[in-house]
């Protein structure tokens, strides 16, 4: 029986509607994925009730022996997964993981060098509206006209800026990041190298993207996105001194009690990431993104950097008379969920943008392969070719609903 349905039908009904949306629409936001029912079940476990301030064997509350077991299992699996010595699995999100890194390793006003938001970076990499741009003196590097990072240029900027920390990682960059080169840049200016791999972590652990280890001094990730686990964050390092500073920065620095039920779910997710089938999934994610990009290029659309090495493509509409927002809405009406995104050389506001970001992880989790992605890519192009044709959008929506119903994700909205 559903306790939720009996107790709060309003929320239950919204859960059911969300299940219907996730089932019948094609989820192509690059940062979203479908997690396992076992992960959701762990999040709904009795660990929801437990306070566990501190760390395993060093708690401020009694009754934490099983919470300790959960957290230690998550830590051990994370270290095995990424090939590192230390992991903090307590951050509630990727942004809080990044905040803890800065709190641990920087003082207010220290110089931070990160990727420009409009070039594919993240708010927490020094963007002015973010705490990272307000508490620290932030500087940026970007991509060249070809949409790719120029590591020689980044070195020039680093030499001019002399940052305390260099952030490498992105939220909308379709090419593989060379962490070895970033470490060389950091060493050349005496900076800490901080890799935020939130978007590519699932590919990294499968050997489908260069690993930040052993190059980075400190690494953060989210546990959802390409890892397909619960929503949350994590920090890793091989340096014992940095690990101690990170632990103190998380608790008591910026968080109180950890979410033990979510840490349990993270451990379950890591078990999935450590399985033999995970490699197959990661390979398919990249193959699906590749065919998506190739079809869109054939149909005359511009991709930032011309293609993809990972799980996403970034379309640029700088040479079109419609915006990223227009494309986002039109595709949404056709049953495809994407997000508007700024692009290099952006001329429109961040609320309108000149691009969209499209990812393959969620539909790959549903079992879709190249054949389905080729079909979907052509439908995306059809909609964009005639962006104001609402009848076409309705017709595509029906076709895609039929496709979606062949790839069932969940048979219930709560676990």
UniProtKB/Swiss-Prot annotation:
PROSITE patterns to which the protein is assigned, alphabetical: SHMT
Signal peptide: none
GO cellular component, one term: cytosol
Amino-acid positions noted as binding (6S)-5,6,7,8-tetrahydrofolate in the UniProt annotation, renumbered to this chain: 117, 121-123, 349-351
Main location: cytoplasm
Enzyme Commission number(s) from the entry: 2.1.2.1
Subcellular location: Cytoplasm
Transmembrane segments: none
Keywords for the protein's UniProt record, in alphabetical order: Amino-acid biosynthesis, Cytoplasm, One-carbon metabolism, Pyridoxal phosphate, Transferase
N6-(pyridoxal phosphate)lysine modification, residue list: 225
Pathway membership: One-carbon metabolism; tetrahydrofolate interconversion; Amino-acid biosynthesis; glycine biosynthesis; glycine from L-serine: step 1/1
Site (Plays an important role in substrate specificity): 224
Cofactor(s) of this protein: pyridoxal 5'-phosphate
Stored InterPro entries: PyrdxlP-dep_Trfase (IPR015424), PyrdxlP-dep_Trfase_major (IPR015421), PyrdxlP-dep_Trfase_small (IPR015422), Ser_HO-MeTrfase (IPR001085), Ser_HO-MeTrfase-like (IPR049943), Ser_HO-MeTrfase_PLP_BS (IPR019798), SHMT-like_dom (IPR039429)
GO biological processes: glycine biosynthetic process from serine; tetrahydrofolate interconversion
GO molecular function ontology, one term from the record: pyridoxal phosphate binding
UniProt similarity note: Belongs to the SHMT family.
PANTHER family: SERINE HYDROXYMETHYLTRANSFERASE (PTHR11680:SF50)
Subunit comment: Homodimer.
NCBIfam families given in the database record: PRK00011.1
Purpose: Catalyzes the reversible interconversion of serine and glycine with tetrahydrofolate (THF) serving as the one-carbon carrier. This reaction serves as the major source of one-carbon groups required for the biosynthesis of purines, thymidylate, methionine, and other important biomolecules. Also exhibits THF-independent aldolase activity toward beta-hydroxyamino acids, producing glycine and aldehydes, via a retro-aldol mechanism.
Protein name per the record: Serine hydroxymethyltransferase 1
Source organism (scientific name): Sulfurimonas denitrificans (strain ATCC 33889 / DSM 1251) (Thiomicrospira denitrificans (strain ATCC 33889 / DSM 1251))
Lineage: Bacteria, Pseudomonadati, Campylobacterota, Epsilonproteobacteria, Campylobacterales
Gene: glyA1
């Amino acid at each position: 029986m559903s306790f939720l349905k009996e107790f709060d039908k309003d929320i239950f009904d919204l859960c059911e509607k969300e299940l219907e949306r996730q089932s019948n629409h094609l989820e192509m936001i690059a940062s979203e994925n479908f997690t396992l029912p076992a992960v959701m079940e762990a999040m709904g476990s009795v660990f929801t009730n437990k306070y566990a301030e501190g760390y395993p064997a060093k708690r401020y509350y009694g009754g934490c022996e099983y919470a300790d077991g959960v957290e230690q299992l998550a830590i051990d699996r994370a270290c095995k997964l990424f090939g590192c010595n230390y992991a903090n699995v307590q951050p509630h999100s990727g942004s809080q993981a990044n905040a803890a890194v800065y709190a641990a390793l920087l003082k207010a006003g220290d110089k931070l060098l990160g990727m420009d938001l409009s070039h594919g970076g993240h708010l927490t990499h020094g963007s002015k509206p973010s705490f990272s741009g307000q508490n620290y003196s932030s500087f940026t590097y970007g991509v060249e006209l070809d949409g790719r990072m120029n590591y020689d240029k980044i070195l020039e900027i680093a030499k001019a800026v002399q940052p305390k920390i260099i952030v490498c990682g992105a939220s909308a960059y379709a090419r593989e990041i060379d962490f070895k080169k970033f470490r060389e840049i950091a060493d050349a200016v005496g900076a800490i190298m901080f890799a935020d791999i939130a978007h590519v972590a699932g590919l990294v652990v499968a050997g489908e993207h260069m690993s930040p280890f052993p190059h980075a001094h400190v690494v953060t990730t989210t546990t959802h996105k390409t890892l397909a686990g619960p929503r949350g964050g994590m920090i890793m390092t091989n340096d014992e001194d940095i690990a101690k500073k990170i632990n103190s920065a998380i608790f008591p620095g910026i968080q109180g009690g950890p979410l033990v039920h979510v840490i349990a779910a993270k451990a379950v997710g890591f078990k999935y990431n450590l399985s033999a089938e995970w490699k197959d999934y990661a390979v398919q994610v990249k193959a699906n993104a590749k065919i998506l990009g190739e079809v869109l290029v054939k149909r005359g659309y511009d991709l930032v950097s011309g293609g993809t090495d990972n799980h996403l493509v970034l379309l640029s509409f700088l040479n079109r008379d419609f915006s990223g927002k227009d494309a986002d809405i039109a595709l949404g009406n056709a049953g495809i969920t994407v997000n508007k995104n700024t692009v290099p050389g952006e001329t429109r506001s961040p609320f309108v943008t000149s691009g969209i970001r499209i990812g393959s992880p969620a539909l790959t989790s549903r079992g879709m392969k190249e054949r389905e992605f080729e079909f979907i890519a052509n439908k995306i192009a059809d909609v964009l070719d005639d962006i104001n044709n609402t009848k076409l959008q309705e017709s595509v929506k029906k076709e895609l609903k039929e496709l979606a119903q062949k790839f069932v994700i969940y048979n219930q909205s709560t676990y």
